[in-house]
Every structure is written in C-alpha cells, then in structure tokens.
C-alpha cells in the first residue's frame, strides 16, 4: 500500500502529475536533477543502481527519494525502458529565474518499451515495434504494428495461429490488448513480453476509422483495402490512440498503412520459426542464427529489412528471380559490390533520421549528416546508372527510385556550420551570412573580451591603480580592487561587496556593456533556435522522398550482403521454379559449417524429395549422427532460396514451397500442465491440419514421449496419412529411432529409407555423417552414453541387459505381452554374470488348455506382414482369452 505523502507545494504538484500516470515511473525535474519519489524511487534505485535516500516531508514524515543529474538522462532512461518500465518525463516548463512562484511543470514525453525514439534505447539493426492485438470472439483477430522510429505501419487479419506467427516474427517490444482480453491473450499466445492493458474504447471501430483517415490523409480507407476490414481498423486505430495518450503527436512520417499479405509469403508457424533458429539461436550465448551468417549489411535499415526477408520468405517466383539476378550480378562484379559498400557506410540510418525530422527531434549534427547521407545516395545512383543495362536491368531499375534531393542538400549545407553541435545552445549552429542580425550579435559577442581588456586598461590608467574586471552570477560584471588602493577609486564607482583584502565595484559604462553582451547571447540563442526550426520545417517537405530513398538503399544493402556472403561462403544460385521436386546436391548446413573448428569441413549430403517418387524419407541412425542437422539444413536451404539468396550446396533445384512445418525437439510446457508428448501431438496435429501439396514437413523423433508401441503406431499412422493424403503429397523428412518404420518402404511406393551412417570401431563410435540409402538397424545408444561420460559400470550393465532383451525378442516370440525378467546385476565384489539364463521360461510349457490355445494362435501369425495396428488387435484378443471365465 502506498504511503501517504504530505502535500507541500512541490509534492502536491508532483502528486497531481503522478495521478495522471500511475503505472509509469515519473522522472520529476527539480533544478538540475530528475527526482523520483516513494515507490518510483524504490524501483528506480533497484533498476539503475542509484542511491535510495529519505527526505523529511512534513511533521514526523519522510518519503523515499532517488535521482540523477538531468544531463545523465540518456544514460539512465534506456535502463528503465529495457527493464520493461513506462517512464513519464516531467520537465520544468519555465525558467526558474523568471518566476518567484512554484515552477510550472508538465509531461514532455511518455516513453514506453514500444514507443521509443532515442538512439540510446533503440538497436540499430532491429525494429522497435509497438503492437495492438484485437481479439473479438469468433477465432479471427487482427494485429497492427508500428515502429515510430521508422514510420513503418503494418496490419494483418487472420487466425490465432497466424497472429502468433506474426508476434514471433516481428518481436514487438510492447503489445496493447483490451483489459478484458488479457487472460485470453495469456492462455492463447506463446509470445511473452511486455503487455499493456487499455480500455475497450481504444479499439472502437468508427472512431478509429476517422482517426486513420486523418493520419493518412485520405477520405476513405478503400484505397488501402481496409474499408471492409473492421478488425484491422480496430487494431490500427488503437495504436494511434495510444500514441496520443503518450503525448506523441508529431507523426507526419506515418503516411501509409500496409497490409501484411499472407498470400505472398511462405508459411512458417511460430514453433518452426524458433526451432530453425532463423533470427536467434535457442542458446544465444553459444550458438549462431541464420541471420548471423547472412547479415553483412552496412546500413541499419538494411539490417532491419534482412530480418523481415528471413521472417517472411517469398512464394512469388517473379520477385525471387528478380532478387537472384541482382545478387548474381553483385557476386560477379566484386568491384561494384565493394564501391557500393563504401557508399552505404556514409549513409547511416536514413530511415530513423527522417522520422526524427517529422517529429521535430533532429539535432543540428544529424541534419548536417543527413546532407552527407544524401550525397552518398547520389554516389550510389551514379555507380548503378553507369552499370551496363544489359548486365542487370533490375539493378538499374531499383536505383531509379533514388531521389538526389539536391536542393535540400544545398539548403542544409548553406544554412548550417560545417561542424554543428549535437544540440542547440552548445555552439554555433547557423552559418554566417544567413541572417544579418545574427552576424552582428555574434560579432559583438566575439569581440566582447577585447572590449573588456581595453576597458580594464583604460580605467586602470585613469585611476592610477591596478584592477581587474570579472563576472559572477550574483553581480554580473564587476571591478575588483585590492584594499590598499581603495582610497584612489573614482567617486562614480559604486561598491557592491567587501572581501578580505579587496573590494568589488560597478560603474555605469560596465553595466551598459553587461546588458548589451548578455542580451546579445540570449538573442543569439533565440535567433538560432528560430532559424534552425525553419530549416527543419523545410527538410520536412522532403519526408516522402527521403523515406523512398531509405527503402531503396535498404534493398540494395540487403542484396549486396547476400552477394558478399555467397562469395565468401561458396554458395550457388539455386533453380527455383513451380516444379514439385527438392533436389539438393552436396548441401551443407549454413550455420553449423561456420562454427566448425579451423581445418574441419562440413560433410555435405544429397537430398532429393519429389511428389511422384521420394515423397517421404524415413531417416534412421544413432544419436549425434547428424539426423536433426540434416533436417534443419534442408529447411534452411529451401528458405534461403525463397528469399532470393544463394545456398550452401554444389547445386540445388527447389520446387516452390508454400510452407515449412517442423516437429523438432522437445518443447515441454509444464507450467500449463502439458507434457512433452501432449505438446508434440498438438504440434503434429496442427501440421497435419495445415499441409498442402507444396508443404515441406520435418518430423524428428515423433512419438518418443510415450511407450514404444504407442510411439511406433502413431508414427506409422502419420506416415501412411502423409502418403495417402487426398489433398496433396507434402514432401517429408521423418527422422526416427523406430527401426520398425523401415518396413514402410515395401508397403508405400513413395516412402524411401535412408540412414545417417555410423560405425563402431574397436568399441568406439565413428560418426560418418553421410546420408546413404537403406534403413539402419542399430541406434548405438549405449555407445553414445559412453561418449557422454556415463560410468563404465552402467554401460557394461546396459550391454548385458541389451543382450538379454535381444535374445528374448529373438527366441521367445511366444512371450509377447508377458513380463520379461532380467537377471540381477552381480555385486561389485562378485564375478561377472554368467550369460543370459535369467530370461523368463516360456509359460506355454504349462499344462493349460487356454494357454495352449494362445500358443497356437500366435504361431499362426505372420510377423513379417503384421502391422502395428494388427499386432495391438491380436494382443487385445489374447487378453480377452486370458480374462474370460472358463
């Protein structure tokens, strides 16, 4: 419970402002410090590592206090935001020197994890999205996303699964949900991050329709394809409402709302996206992601665009081929690639600088850098336009979107000094010759010291005494004379202060000069501020061409990055077409091969999947042999091909894939009461209900979370379903330890067995990591356990038990369904066990007619043709015989 704060005038003002933002940490400007009080102070001290103190606050009361100097805001604000806290910045709105009353204060900015504009909080190559999720009843919803730092505004409608994938891909820093929908959000979505609850009216459709039209400058949303999409209007408008609530009103850079077109994107569900480690390794401290391998971008907006390309691979063949041709050109022409990279280095974050212009937050130094960036954009255009048209028409067409903005460059260069400061008031901003009054005032200010020296010499000679002229904040300019000479001071001087051994005086000419010089400095500050704001307004007229330039440079940067990684890593250009075959020759895992120790090479493998021949590959082999890597490798090569990248292989032919689905690795959700097996079955069911003829499916160890026979039966049935599915023949890689599944090759024409080879040499495992035709009969589990450091006594005992179980399976077929007895291990001091004599005797030797009947029935079973389902039915039949009264 919050402690009551005694309302002194200052604290009363604080409480009134705090009441408007109870869920935010309030940074309250007091003099040269930002202060926090009470619970805010406790939280700030913990997050920032600053001292928590107490101050008197009325009779027998105290209040917690923590603060930091105002100039350290850029240091401490990012820490609060990254801790997931909303921060309200309350500044002094008037000069304390000009008022004798309580200084007027107000909120100048409300910073939240999703609404950030400061470079010190933002990550260069990551977007900082604010999301709004609208979930009415009915199973459909909408998600809108805005990066206020770039102006990118997106919206999409769809199923819960689609929206969950978008959350995984875009990774917003903050999600807005209706207060009443919070519990449903937590139950439904796997995404975990900062969620802020808002009132229902925030998503009101009709109000939001008008708000969107006003922001985007349109009379109707029809041209954006949103007129008949109330779900999209609700979520997109909610974002604009939230920006208004957080005092972000300068939004002229938000000029369009783009729908995320699911029809043009490869489908990747959220689990597949995470398990393939596309943007982030599942163990970031040790591993790398696909993004880490492919990202050689130079500009921040190029890095952000590459993340989006990897999140949403294309299924548009024309666009894939366009990117491929540009990448191929840049692979061939290393000199052009190098020169483009040098130009990109001079452009910086054009996208975010443009947004700062719109919000009126661009600094003088950034404005000057903008002119330099536009010069570099011109160099890019010149480089590409000089490139032969016949070599790559698409590259030149892309560069044609660049606008040089030469008039703007000239305006900035003429208006600003060559090296302007980072902020107004810290040095000369406006160049000489722009404003005559400013030039005169600067001349007065610059030559003021010369005047003071002359005045000091003149007065000293006239009075015949030594003296000095100085300045302080109390008296302004004054003359200081030692006590020994005060008797010779002119009568026109006025004494202002007596010191030990000296007196301080003023006289009329000195005060006149003071008024003039101090007035000049204040006037310079006002004039520079006005002239600079006029320049920013002129720059703002170019927001749309600047945004187009940023988008074009980002594309060129991404394509150049893909060309550089292709050249460096020996990638090849894949054939991508409308065929139904995936044929990869000597494919390599793009991430693993970059992590291998120096001198060690990745073992390449061929993979061929086709709807008419090898639709399903059943892959067996021991743990650590490389089955999982092979599955992921195939998926990543396919994904890379469909963003327009070259791929790690000797050759690759990719028939267009519309979705990749994986069931790879365990993903327990114990906190929700869901076991590994339950989650596995849910994910498998989702895949089977979503597949198409152009899907690529990866199953790794499906069914291992339950009993052996249950697992085999489920895996068998799923393979049959995928093979016989009337809606299409999805290409499937099925890695398993269930060697019984090898029998499917002889039963289903498009199922082929492969194994990742391994050998046991003198008791040691040798992993060859080569995919070869045919199934494997051994898992080498005990050998892998030995490699993992399992105590020798355990692996020796496990070997004994394995031999007994294999003998029982081989010789006691009639023991099906009965308990197998294992001989007890010998005590450490005893001699080793003598053989496998402890396997249970056959109970069919007993003189019992029912057991004899069972024996006859079992002997009639053809084990070679028995399916798992038929075996389970036979067991049920035998069980009924044993339990039926005779």
PLM regions and their residue ranges:
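Charged, surface-exposed helical/loop "interaction arms" that form contiguous linear patches used
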Residues: 359, 363, 373-376, 393, ...
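Short hinge/gating elements
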Residues: 54-67, 149, 153, 217-226, ...
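Conserved phosphate-binding elements of NTP-dependent enzyme cores
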Residues: 2-4, 12-16, 23, 536, ...
